[in-house]
């Protein structure tokens, strides 16, 4: 379709711009929960047509990306929260681990964080159905994080976050949505300086401004159309 073509071309132009500056770009589509797991209501019949992701991935030979769909389908465990639409902390860690591998920078800490905090959050589906619910989802928490927040950060839902890790390597600019909330802590441990930006359109001037070595673009499968609807600022005429 025209939308798929425009999305792919936008990503290609972003990557061309970024790699021309001797920097690396990586694209991540966060799968919809129902794209990976069963148990949808019986009145929702699964379409036999190819999904937007399937059609998109077939055209992205010139874009560096993580196939998070294959990554999660290759695992027996469920890596999404039970009462939330997002991947859980273990799932986020899997994606971060894969991203660092593809960017040629293995994780500084190879061990998955082991501190398990029960009832640390309330899932978005739970809040939708039962607004007064108490926290009922568990989270993995880094036992001894080295990174620090530069921006005043009350929540990872904030549209703009900056971090510093004195022992990290290089710098990162990440254009993201809420799926990256539980990626931020892990990524921030790897980079001396990192920026996480939820604003759309993507402002690629930040890549040069902050001398980013790596650029990660993460977006939910259900929001893929936003890439071709809101062209990155450097493409705007």
Predicted regions located by residue number:
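Extracellular glycan-modifying ectodomains
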Residues: 1-237
């Amino acid at each position: 379709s025209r939308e798929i073509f425009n999305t792919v071309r936008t990503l290609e132009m972003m990557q061309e711009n970024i790699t021309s500056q001797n920097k690396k770009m990586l694209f991540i589509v966060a799968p919809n929960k129902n794209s990976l797991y069963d148990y949808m209501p019986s009145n929702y019949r699964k379409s036999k047509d190819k999904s937007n992701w399937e059609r998109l991935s077939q055209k992205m030979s010139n874009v560096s990306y993580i196939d998070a769909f294959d990554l999660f389908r290759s695992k027996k465990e469920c890596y999404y929260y039970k009462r939330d639409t997002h991947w859980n902390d273990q799932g986020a860690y899997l994606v971060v681990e894969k991203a660092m591998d593809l960017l040629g920078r293995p994780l500084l800490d190879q061990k998955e964080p082991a501190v398990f905090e029960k009832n640390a959050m309330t899932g978005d589906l739970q809040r939708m159905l039962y607004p007064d619910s108490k926290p009922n989802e568990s989270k993995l928490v880094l036992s001894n994080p080295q990174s620090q927040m530069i921006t005043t950060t009350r929540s990872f839902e904030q549209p703009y976050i900056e971090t510093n890790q004195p022992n990290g390597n290089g710098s990162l600019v990440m254009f993201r949505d809420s799926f990256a909330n539980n990626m931020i802590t892990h990524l921030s441990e790897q980079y001396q300086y990192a920026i996480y930006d939820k604003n759309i359109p993507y402002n690629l001037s930040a890549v040069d401004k902050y001398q980013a070595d790596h650029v990660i673009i993460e977006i939910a499968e259900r929001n893929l159309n936003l890439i071709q609807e809101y062209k990155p600022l450097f493409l705007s005429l």
